[in-house]
Amino acid sequence: MEVHHVTEGAETFTCNAFLVIGEETTLVDAGSWDGVVDVIADHTDDLDRVVLTHQHGDHVEQLEAVVEAFDPEVYAHSHHELRDHDISDGDTVQIGDEEFEVVYTPGHADDHVSFVSESTLFSGDVVVHDDGAFEYGSFGRTDMPGQSREQLIESIEDILERMPADVEHMYAGHGGIFHGDVRDVVETALERAEKREPKYPEE
């Protein structure tokens, strides 16, 4: 699967946005960096769809610009004025050349979904490989209004239950891309989340 990290060169705060080239060329999250459209255009003139993990500002701020530039179909769990398709837990959506199962994963955000295939996990902000808190196996923050550590723990458990054993690629909403034993990363994140300790000292 050909994946490009669209926001890798961003100089302002944004989520990771990933362009997946294939039969259904797809952008996973739109990011908040104003260079997103230009980077997509460097790789393709044909963007078929955008799928959103959730609608925090750092994930959707550039959605309108992307839709205006490429006219893709927009897939999201919760309402958005630009949404074309409602996706729910257990649905399937094609990203690039692979079919992904939609896993509803609230906790960091009420509308959060993750996408899992036979080889790949797009985890959004529920699980990340590395971030400012942990270098291996971290999880989304749950200290802001509308967030829940208990829901996040259940969501990570759902990912583990529904993720095939051979998944080797994880693309998260923040931090680095991970290639290897994704299950171990997710299990490590779960163990840390279950301690119910603050992710950051100020929590």
Predicted regions and their residues:
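Active-site HxH/HxHxD metal-binding segment of metal-dependent hydrolases
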Residues: 14, 30-98, 188-191
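Conserved beta-strand hairpin/beta-sheet module of binuclear metal-dependent hydrolase folds
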Residues: 1-40, 113-130
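Histidine-centered catalytic micro-motifs
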Residues: 50-60, 105-111, 170-177
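Conserved N-terminal boundary motif of the eukaryotic protein kinase catalytic domain
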Residues: 99-103
